[in-house]
Amino acid sequence: ASALAVMLLEPAHARTQHLLLEASCIGGSCIAVCWLAGGIAPTMTPFFLCLLLGFVFFDRPLATVFGLALMVVTWVMVPVPAEVVSGLVIGALTVFVVMRQANKMSAILVAGPVAGLSTALVYGALSGVAGERLPVIAANAGYLVAGGLIAAAFAVGSTFIFERLFNVATVMRLRELLDTGNKLLAQLFESAPGTYHHSLNVANLAAGAAQRIGANWLLARVGGYYHDIGKLLHPQFFGENRGELPNIHEDISPELSTKVILEHVQAGVTIATGHHLPAEVIDIIAEHHGTTVVQFFYDKASAERANLSPEAFRYQGPKPHTRESTLVFLADGVEAAARSLTKMDKAALEGLIDGVVSARVTDGQLAESQLTLGEIRVVKDYFLASLISFYHVRDAYLSAEEANERS
């Protein structure tokens, strides 16, 4: 069933397919051994294991489809009584209910035992009505409960090992990273509150755009949350964190200002690696400025020195190479530029978005991305609608009409 899901369903990210195939080998081998061994006792552990792993690897709707397919495969492959099949249905429904709003791996430690217990209760009740001997019912019910416990422990343990071994972003791991109370985001909020709120806005823009074009919205949102964590190194050098403090850049050279600003990308990669963030998220951090030039300080330095090369003012990249990374890259530029607008209306926002995106296309920053021209248009339209809503922008004629009504 896991292998079938790899072919028919799209996991959280292409890299995750490798991890899922590893899990398929484990679960498939267990089912094969249990099928040969026969009996109820060993069969339920791999069933619950694969069911739980579905919620680790897939979004919830896909995990539900995966679970239904798994029940059918188990019913066909493993000769178990109707009482057990009925119990499995209830157990699977229990997993769906428990995992429906789960955002942490610890939920699996609850879902597995509860599923095993509910399956055992249904099996016991139906077997009792069918006249099965009590010792047999008790033994098999115990096996079912144990199967849920073992599956939960194995799912959590194996997922942790695989995530660390292959450094991939499972759906459950990404959901954990969305918790704004975790240590890294809490530190960002405390030390760089302006950057923190900017990151939330970027995440909202990137995730919404990802949903519109069928990209991985969950990865885009997480990437938006963490893309600027490198600013923790020198938060006071970035305007959104300055507040009422003096502008430190007025007292230093444009070259030094640029050096500190450029460093935040590599600092973010270092911090993310130290906190064991998935490789896909680290890629977004590394690529969120591409190879663009820190234009303000380049222009400032050029005014002081003629024929100045822009290379010393250029981010090292690489350029964004996935749709999710590109969306964060574009959302970052658009959100930052929007905050600097003095006149906030639809025409100004539309011109700003067109300008930011066109400049990046012309500069070749999207050359390695996977976005089509049609998708870029969809993204721009979404950015515009989202920013209009966020800034409560009204058309000029509506504002004038309201003013007349209130006068």
Predicted regions and their residues:
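Generic detector of multi-pass transmembrane helix bundles and their immediately adjacent loops
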Residues: 6-196
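Conserved catalytic-loop aspartate of Hanks-type protein kinases
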Residues: 1
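Hydrophobic transmembrane alpha-helix bundles
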Residues: 102-108, 120-128, 146-150, 195-199, ...
